[in-house]
Each structure stands twice: as structure tokens, then as C-alpha cells.
Amino acid sequence: MKGFIDDVDYSVGLLDEGTNLGNVIDNYVYEHTLTGKNAFFVGDLGKIVKKHSQWQNVVAQIKPFYTVKCNSAPAVLEILAALGTGFACSSKNEMALVQELGVPPENIIYISPCKQVSQIKYAAKVGVNIMTCDNEIELKKIARNHPNAKVLLHIATEDNIGGEEGNMKFGTTLKNCRHLLECAKELDVQIIGVKFHVSSACKESQVYVHALSDARCVFDMAGEIGFTMNMLDIGGGFTGTEFQLEEVNHVISPLLDVYFPEGSGVKIISEPGSYYVSSAFTLAVNIIAKKVVENDKFPSGVEKTGSDEPAFMYYMNDGVYGSFASKLSEDLNTIPEVHKKYKEDEPLFTSSLWGPSCDELDQIVESCLLPELNVGDWLIFDNMGADSFHEPSAFNDFQRPAIYYMMSFSDWYEMQDAGITSDSMMKNFFFVPSCIQLSQEDSFSAEA
């Protein structure tokens, strides 16, 4: 099955039964070693299709609006658009990206908490009416620049207020909601619903209980003031595991039945991001420099070998000014795998991993145990599909890694069963035979 050909900026390889993603990574490591290329990603688009099927099976009553800033790679957006998800956009560029795919404006939400006036005007121009708001100043800005705006009032959760610094800045209190609703009435701004967000790091199911209870209170307040609200956005916070999704559904499903029952006219939506893409992308990085240091130079409390053994600092060709940008604000939740084969009884050494910038902030892994590696060896990082695809920094002449998209035949058939056809995908699929050894000339990739 050689698929179809269109003038596109990327290709997607179809893997036969004898080829897996490990084989693909091996081939590209070989190619990049020969040509001295940069780090690269391999994206398994079939995993995105599987995540959507999982979502439909577990929480079919909640419509997903994919958070574009999480990963705006064109192949990702095209697959999700073909699957029928909505999109949560934070900027004009993101809105334009998804509208170019034919996504109707009603399937787009403008979720930036701090909106530029020019971008509010752009949303008005292209018909993106649904947006979020959590304060009076933002509400007035919307009123002046978007006459058809339909606003979701963003309320804080106990999770936000309780100490997660990245989220506590956004979302209004329940106490302040009546004031904002009255302001909206005076400004003639239509409030159509409520949004809240619970972090994926939150382990307390009671946070959802309180958030949904608060949302119901806001709906009741709005009714008293004269608004008819019809949308509830339960935010993101989905890690990507079926277990976590089922756990969340176990908590919220009975509450939704009580507070927003079927037939109430309230549409339930969510903003999954990393849920869809995290596990779909693997990053391969090359070691470009190495230092031998004393073991006691590593901070106490980290995983170390004996003090009389050497420790190593390895510098890679990607770091926080590239694909590991999220490391600046959160801990890395993936452990590197050594690509080369080594013996089971080979000694392990205390090691730290760094990006290429020589900046003290550019530390990727503080401490881990690895066999001794050499310059030119490769490390593989799984679960790198979320927050890794930002514009490359000019720091240290960083270049964006290539992305090689793949999918198994079984996933391709599953995609067709889901209603995605070649015409709707507009992709250039090609067949990847088993055990193929790729060279520079017969490479079938395209840079993102």
C-alpha cells in the first residue's frame, strides 16, 4: 500500500508488521551519525489515534478541545482535525493554523488569559467568538473589541490557590464571580459558561468535587442575573494514561449527572494537550562533549555510586533552549535510554546530562546511573511530545530537530475505521519495508 501523494511539507511512513519504531530510530541514528546531523524526533501518529479512541471509550460525553500550544506540529493538528476534536488556541498564529485546516470557528476557543487587543480583534474578524476571562479589565477589553464574544468565566480551583505557582495567577474566586457577571451584564458581554483547570499533578479527587460545585454555583448566579449559560470547560490536566482518565471519569461522571445532567442543555468540554501527544514522540540526542568529575561534586541526596568511582557530565546537542524548554519550569518526567548495546554487568556511573549552551540552567538530568558513554553516543528520551516544539532559540546557534512521522499499518486501518480518509488527511504516505537500512539518499523524512 503506497498510499497517496500530495504537495505537503512532511511525510508519514507506513510500517509493515516486521518493522517497529525501534527499527526506525536505529536507522535514523545510523543516518545522523554518518551526516553529523542534529537531534531528531520520531513521531508515532498512530498513538494519537489510539488516544482519541481511548477518550471516546472512557469520556465520550466530554468533547476534547486540543491545546495547540502543547504541540503545534502540522501532522498532529491535521490528524486531530480529521478526528473531529476542537482546538484551544492561545494566539493569533494558533487560530490561523487550525483554521487553515478547515476547522470551523465554533470548534475553536481563544484561551489566553492575557489577550492582546490586536488578537482579540483578529478573533472577532475570523469568527472565533468563544474565549475565556477571569477579571474585570480583561472583560472590558473584550467588550470594546469583540462585539460577538461568548465568554467562559475562568474560576480558580483549590488546586490553583493551594500552591501550584504556574496556575495560581489565573482564575477568579467564587466570591468575585457575581461582580464579574454584573460587570458583563452592564458591558453587554455574553457569558455562556464556566471554565476551571485541575493540574495533572493534583492527586486529590476532592478538587474536582469542589470545582464542579463552584461551577454549578456560578451557573445559578448567572441565571439570577439574566444569563443563560450552556457550556462547562473542565480544563486539561490529563496525563495520557487510561488509568488516570478512568479515575477522573469515576469522580466527575456522577457529579456531572447531578449538577449538569443530560438534557440540561450544557455542553461539557475539556482541553487535553499532553494527553494526546506526549507518548507519541521520541527524541534522540547525541553526546557532543564529556567531562570526568569527582563523585562528591554531585549534590547530596541524588543517586550516586561509590565516592571512589568517577562521575561523568555529558553534554548533548539539545537542551533547555530547544526541545527541553519545559525543563525550565518543571521537572523532566522521562528517563533517558542508552541507544548502544551494553552488557548487563557493565558498571554504572553517576552521571548528569546537560544541553549544549554551557549555561548553568541548561541541566536536563541532575543525576542518573549510566554506563560510561563516549562522544558520539546517542540517548533516547521517550514521552517528549508535549511542550518540545517551540521556535528554536538563537542561543548557541540551536537548530530545530527534524521530525520523522511514522504509523503502523494496523493504526492506519484503525484511522480509516475512525472515518479519516486520504482526502481528508492530505498526507503523503509511503511504505517502509522491514529491516530497511536508510541512507542519506533514500531518506524519507521532512523537517518540521
UniProtKB/Swiss-Prot annotation:
Q: Which InterPro entries match?
A: Ala_racemase/Decarboxylase_C, Azin1, De-COase2_C, De-COase2_CS, De-COase2_N, Orn/DAP/Arg_de-COase, Orn_de-COase, PLP-binding_barrel
* A single GO molecular function term of this UniProt record: ornithine decarboxylase activity
Q: Where in the cell is it found?
A: Nucleus
- Annotated signal sequence is none
Q: Which GO terms describe its cellular component?
A: cytoplasm; nucleus
Q: Please give the CDD domains that the UniProt record associates with this protein.
A: PLPDE_III_ODC_like_AZI
Gene3D superfamilies given for it? Answer: Alanine racemase, Lyase, Ornithine Decarboxylase, Chain A, domain 1
Q: At which residues is there a site annotated Not modified? A: K69
Identify the keywords attached in UniProt to this record, alphabetized.
Answer: Nucleus, Polyamine biosynthesis, Ubl conjugation
| Domain of life per record | Eukaryota
Q: Which GO terms describe its biological process?
A: negative regulation of protein catabolic process; positive regulation of polyamine transmembrane transport; putrescine biosynthetic process from arginine, via ornithine
The UniProt entry, under Pfam families, shows: Orn_Arg_deC_N, Orn_DAP_Arg_deC
Q: How is it modified after translation?
A: Ubiquitinated, leading to its proteasomal degradation; a process that is reduced in presence of antizyme OAZ1.
Q: How does it assemble?
A: Monomer. Interacts with OAZ1 and OAZ3; this interaction disrupts the interaction between the antizyme and ODC1.
Q: Indicate the family of this protein.
A: Belongs to the Orn/Lys/Arg decarboxylase class-II family. ODC antizyme inhibitor subfamily.
The function of this protein is: Antizyme inhibitor (AZI) protein that positively regulates ornithine decarboxylase (ODC) activity and polyamine uptake. AZI is an enzymatically inactive ODC homolog that counteracts the negative effect of ODC antizymes (AZs) OAZ1, OAZ2 and OAZ3 on ODC activity by competing with ODC for antizyme-binding. Inhibits antizyme-dependent ODC degradation and releases ODC monomers from their inactive complex with antizymes, leading to formation of the catalytically active ODC homodimer and restoring polyamine production.
Q: What is this protein called?
A: Antizyme inhibitor 1
- Source organism per entry reads Pongo abelii (Sumatran orangutan)
